[in-house]
Amino acid sequence: MLHFLPAPILFVINFVWLSIGTTLISIPVLLMALIKLILPIRPVLKVVDVVNQLAFKCFCLNNAFLIRLTNKADWDIQGFENIKINGSCIIISNHVTWADIVLLCHLYRGRIPITKFFLKQSLIWIPVIGQVCYAVGMPFFRRYSRAKILKNPK
């Protein structure tokens, strides 16, 4: 719809929209994280998970709207007919751009359960984003050098 605008204006629209949307969506997730810490009992944890999944769906919908609003993208997607919505699946992608997460959420939205990503441990320190990813249960990992692994393989 707005793809005809000059790139600097599209950048501002995307940046502002993503910043506001991400901040608004992160508020309930961070509140749920506090509740999860204070009341770690099964019924409360189930409610927290439902709220977090809803927030993540809102994040994906917000991003999908922005992609449609500011881009003229023609998608050629094949293979969705074999995806089982109720089952788990592993998506393997060659990490090419910072937009991978946003694009995968957009493309698989409504077709598979909530997408979780393995994230580098250092990303947990990014304000708001890192804490939200931790709160919704995304796994973090550390990368070790070959020498360090050989020295201590545990």
Question: What are the residue ranges of the model-derived segments?
Answer:
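Membrane-anchoring hydrophobic helices of lipid-metabolizing enzymes
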Residues: 1-89, 103
